[in-house]
Amino acid sequence: MTRSRRWIVAAIAVGFAVRVAFALGYWVEQPLTHDEREYLALARSIARGDGVVYPADEPVTGTAQRFGRAPGYPVFLAMLHVTQPVDTVPARVKIAQSAVGAIGVWLIALIGGRAAGPRGAVAAAGIAAVYPPLVFMPAYALSETLYCTVALAAAWVLGTVTLTLSERPGSVTVTVPNRKSVTVTVLGAGLTGIGILVRPAMLFFVPFAAAWMVWKRETRHAVIFVLVTLASVAPWTVRNARVHGRFVLVASEGGVTFWTGNNPLARGEGDMAANPELKRAELEFRNRHADLTPEQREPLYYREAFAWIRRHPAQWTALLARKVFYTIVPLGPSYTLHSKKYLVASAGAYLLLLPPALAGAWRLRRGCAPVALWLLAASTVFVSVVFFPQERFRIPVIDPALIVSAAALAAARSHEHTGCRSNL
């Protein structure tokens, strides 16, 4: 085992240890959020063999609606034998997610190594192992940790698809055989489909990746990628049509999310928890359509949001500008809901990472840029602007992309000794 690999293994071990230490030693006996309760409730139904439905014995708390959710994360929780009602996140869930997070550290190292060589891999693994937002997330029964690792796996696999490479002085050009590239594309599409079933926001990665393939004159791979991804999601879409009586591609929460981010009361960042006025407006909206189910109300949310956009294009444009700002700068209204300690650890870590990440990205732009990961990050930014930015949306994809970019500064030279594989 080379020295760099030993360092990466050590970083993975440290990453697992600090995640478990935070989850079991600090974040203990914490009450569940609404999303955590819903995920755990769905997991109980799946574990009991009742399917992805809310159990009858699960109490309704607060005023939030129960939408049909993507099945990936509840299935993951069900595999951990979550069968009884709980008031806090079970320890086995925290430990399992810490292991998943450690795999994410490894994937970040792999992507960093491809982009910037062994030193870049070690630097990426070291940063990812102790980066506070990634350390915190396994302590919650939320989909971010699982989604992060699945999305990184898709970006890593798709990053090996190489059909045409440009020669550069001093570089080693590696070409993946055409048949193998098709197989890799299919595997990457399958992982993308799994990612969508964990977190539907990954749907927006599909057109970004396909457009890149077409631009690189690999239309056949783009078609294969799109078709296999949609085929991976299709069985769940068919199930939704049977259960809800209407087309629901993955989850039925898109309408209220779009309405939340495109509303005259929207502030440009954060959900309704950070905006009481918007929450009251949403309750009034539901009262006007009290005879409908959440799934039946979904298109009505879209309709009202688009109507406001058409009537007030200037106000909506200003709102988009605020969304772009808050996507980059962690100063939105939702951050005030956290303690100062959390704000310093989370937003502070992100702000420290941002400058070297921008410098590293500039260095990588003409070398072995992690294009697949960057496209995934770009699609996440797009989602934040279309809907609304929030820290939980940023952490799984944008922060790992920044870590890989920052790690490029640790490379002595631009990947001259290890060769380079272009992405997608």
Model-predicted regions and their roles:
Residues 71-78, 83-103, 137, 141, ...:
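Loop-to-helix entry region of an early transmembrane alpha helix in multi-pass inner-membrane enzymes
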Residues 92-116, 153, 355-359:
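Transmembrane-helix motifs of polytopic, lipid-linked glycan transferases
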Residues 41-46, 60-86, 99, 145, ...:
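Short hydrophobic/aromatic helix or loop-helix immediately within or flanking a transmembrane segment
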Residues 15-18, 124-132, 136, 156, ...:
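Short helix- or helix-capping micro-motifs
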Residues 124-125, 157, 184-199, 209-213, ...:
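Membrane-interface alpha helices of multi-pass inner-membrane proteins
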Residues 241, 249-322:
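Membrane-proximal stem/loop segments at transmembrane-domain junctions that anchor or position
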Residues 88, 92, 99, 300-301, ...:
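Membrane-interface anchor segments at the N-terminal boundary of transmembrane helices
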Residues 10, 108-130, 148-149, 368-371:
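Transmembrane-helix signature of polytopic, membrane-embedded enzymes
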